Design a protein with these regions (language model features):
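Intrinsically disordered, low-complexity regulatory regions in eukaryotic proteins
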Residues: 9-119
Length: 119
């Protein structure tokens, strides 16, 4: 049975943050270079690859390409117009030295490996 996607205001949608938290580059909803972790921390592709080495500075997980929310409302209530991106800019919570040490410590551990496996 096919179930319709709920489209009321209580439906959670991925938070589309407007900027890279590292370099503050604008990342509009259609930005193909936007990357997110499982907590929706948002960075540009350049910072993820060259500064963070695919290590989220907050949770320590890896990154994936952020999905692009459709501009056209193909289904009722589901579009960037109906579910707009956030306008709240987010910035790093840690110093650059701390980020470098954090990344160096865990960058060679795949994000899918649990701590229990490492012990």
């Amino acid at each position: 049975m096919i179930r319709p996607v709920p489209t009321d205001e209580t439906t959670m949608a991925l938070q589309l943050r407007p900027n890279c938290e590292y370099c503050d580059k604008d990342l509009p909803p259609h930005a193909v270079e936007a990357r997110i972790c499982s907590y929706e921390c948002t960075f540009c592709e350049d910072c993820v690859e060259n500064k963070l080495h695919n290590v989220c500075p907050n949770c320590g997980g890896g990154f994936v390409a952020r999905p692009i929310r459709p501009a056209k409302e193909w289904r009722p209530g589901l579009s960037v117009e109906k579910r707009p991106p956030s306008d709240k800019r987010v910035h790093l919570s840690y110093s650059l030295d701390d980020l470098a040490a954090h990344s160096a410590r865990i960058r060679n551990i795949p994000p899918n490996i649990t701590v229990a496996v490492l012990l």
